[in-house]
Amino acid sequence: MIADYEDPASIDAAIESVDAIFYQAQSMGDVERCNRQTETVRKAAEKAGVELIVVNSSMWAPDEPCGQYNFDGVLSMEEIMRAGPIPVVVFRPTLFMSNLHGDRIKDNLRKGLYRYCHKPDLASDWICLEDVAQFMVTALKKPELAGRKIGIGGPDRLTTLEVVDLVGEGSPQGARAIAEDARPA
């Protein structure tokens, strides 16, 4: 079933007769739009009698506003979803391993460069989307998780330089890190 967050009727049709929904909003960009879309989905879920909402926040989020636009935007999305009467479980993955599959990353790796907007010593928990999906499916069977915000990541917390070493092992020319500033120009 295809639904468009900007089209309430398509959301209504997509969640008709379901007990639970998985929700993933955009993780960066227009916070107001994301919040509006989240509220549209929440209201449709309330109207449809959905019993549980499982959210993939797509990234880390603070528990209180921190002053960083994207992180605070994810927090506001979570809080809008949690503001309704339906129990909500939020999963907060840190970084997706599939981020390394993008054309920009691959093109740079072919040149022996690893460019990512993290400092060399920043340690993060990378996770694959398949594992995120497993957490979300498991939440359907664990009602005691309702109301929780759960940070999830892979088994190893890796610094950017450790990721470069691992990625470089799979590249004939190796890889060296190029730290990029995460702030917009």
Located regions from the model:
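Cofactor-binding loops of NAD(P)H-dependent oxidoreductases
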Residues: 2-3
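Glycine-rich, N-terminal phosphate-binding loop of Rossmann-like dinucleotide-binding domains
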Residues: 24-25, 57
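Short, conserved SAM-binding segment of the class I
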Residues: 37-40, 44
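Mobile cap/lid helix-loop segments that border enzyme active or cofactor-binding sites
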Residues: 179-185
